[in-house]
Amino acid sequence: GGVLASLCDVALAGAVSSSMEKNQWCLTAQLDVEYINPAFPGEIFAFGKLVKRGSNLAFVEGGIESKDKKLIARAHGIWIIKNFTVNK
């Protein structure tokens, strides 16, 4: 379960980061994963979709599918978006 949750975390973070500016970073505030079917050896695919984005929060959903499109895990979460500045 932990490996699948980590894959969901990365996929959903990717969906968030695709909407961010270069001076922003994000971190997981909440991640919920539902395990639907077992994952067997072979190719699996993690995916994420941005559902709603505000200035400080992003809501995302996604999951993991097998090569034959069988849903293995479903995930949704909230990401915090922060601006950063570089001090010289």
Functional labels for PLM-detected ranges:
Residues 1-13:
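Hot-dog-fold acyl-thioester-processing enzymes
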Residues 13-45, 50:
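Hydrophobic beta-strand-centered segment that forms part of the acyl-chain substrate-binding groove
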Residues 38-47, 51-88:
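HotDog/MaoC-like acyl-thioester-processing domains
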